[in-house]
């Protein structure tokens, strides 16, 4: 058989194999078109489970007369116009093939009118070449689509349709999902002339919960925990059923939406399941209705023929964000309120969060300043006249006692500046200018070695080895523990009994290294890590660290810091001159012993005399 171009109708029927799976698929595509057109009311009329008639009527913006023929053509759409639009899709439809595909396997009629037009127009396609005929019609502003005799010209597809009741149940489920996605739209569903579902548009939270109960049932509404979780461009809201009271009937309620688009995404389901797994039985599933809002540039919706799945550019971030949002709500449900104290405790000192250069991890913290006055004055200040607990005229609730005459002598004494005594001269011998320096960086060799010039000699320094020694110094606690940096999204890992025992045994030492965690029955949650580890792949590093600890019988902070320093990934696969100079400056400041006595593998002298002698003999 020779290669030939397929006729338009046959090409559309092939595309319909992906777009039009059953009558519910037609309803989904057409209702989503109505929502994209700005409709606030959509009426869906079904006959014989959709096999005989599917009629979708909306009050959207309508379609202009000159665009009706294009609306039934393949790859014609008003949703996108460029690659930039495709990479940031905000509409439900965008491919421009739904109407063409549906019209190729049914008798489709499109009637529409815009607010600017005096009359409506009707279009339908027929024949082998799918020629479109347009004629006047009577219709209010909006659009009506009638799909008659679905699969009438493809008997094989029609044979695979189920019973009328089954097909209508699939349509009913689609409308339920859409009703949960768009609370601001009225949806009316009729079957064989009888109104079956009526979801009125709602705006207030209480009304939304009533619609939620009408769709998901009262048992779900009674156990639903509201979620409102946000970070940057990510927002998670909705409801999740309390896992402690989840029944078999509730487990069928699993609705998830990404930017208003209904989804069945395994990554999202896994994150929710992981957050609830400690409270669910082996045969139980979580029940939820969740809405994820994300920057359209960070999600690709064009990865599934029926648009049931999406692909996130930062899937791990999205997974952990959803997991933490659901987990926080479940934890709030189980937490009990702590009794309030009369006097607030002193605020915990948090060290300044800067890029690691070494000094911030080991600097002695200054005394923290009081964030607020205590509820009751700690000192009476002598005879205060009983005014310490009253508000001042300015309205300050905790005004301090004024200047007392009895304290005048004390204040004057404190204000006197003592005469400075001359400091004794230092007897420390002056250091040579090059004694605490590796020398001058000449160039980078091989991507990971620095060629140095020092006191007339040339040396080759391994930058990865120097970086490892620097990391070890940054991770080794000095007079105070290493500053812990809280993780935005804590890392939750499953551990064995031996690993859990090792972690509990080493918990205090890990705390000195800036690694903070909490453990439960079978899991450990990493809450904070030291700053040098913030950019590491903790999904790999932390499990390896736990495995290392489980193999040890005794623990020491130096050994743990050394292991971490050897196993962290370098941030510089290829070193530049600026990066090498910055690294050596940090090493010279934090690891001066490396300059005095370089360890093996760090420095290698370069013998220039042999090369010079070889040149002289030529």
From Swiss-Prot:
Residues 366-381 have a biased composition (Low complexity). Residues 366-403 are annotated as: Disordered. Residues 382-392 have a biased composition (Gly residues). One of its GO terms (cellular component) is mismatch repair complex. GO terms for molecular function: ATP binding; ATP hydrolysis activity; ATP-dependent DNA damage sensor activity; mismatched DNA binding. GO terms for biological process: mismatch repair. The keyword DNA damage applies. The keyword DNA damage applies. Keywords: DNA damage, DNA repair. Belongs to the DNA mismatch repair MutL/HexB family. This protein is involved in the repair of mismatches in DNA. It is required for dam-dependent methyl-directed DNA mismatch repair. May act as a 'molecular matchmaker', a protein that promotes the formation of a stable complex between two or more DNA-binding proteins in an ATP-dependent manner without itself being part of a final effector complex. This is DNA mismatch repair protein MutL. It comes from Salmonella typhimurium (strain LT2 / SGSC1412 / ATCC 700720). The lineage of its organism: Bacteria, Pseudomonadati, Pseudomonadota, Gammaproteobacteria, Enterobacterales.
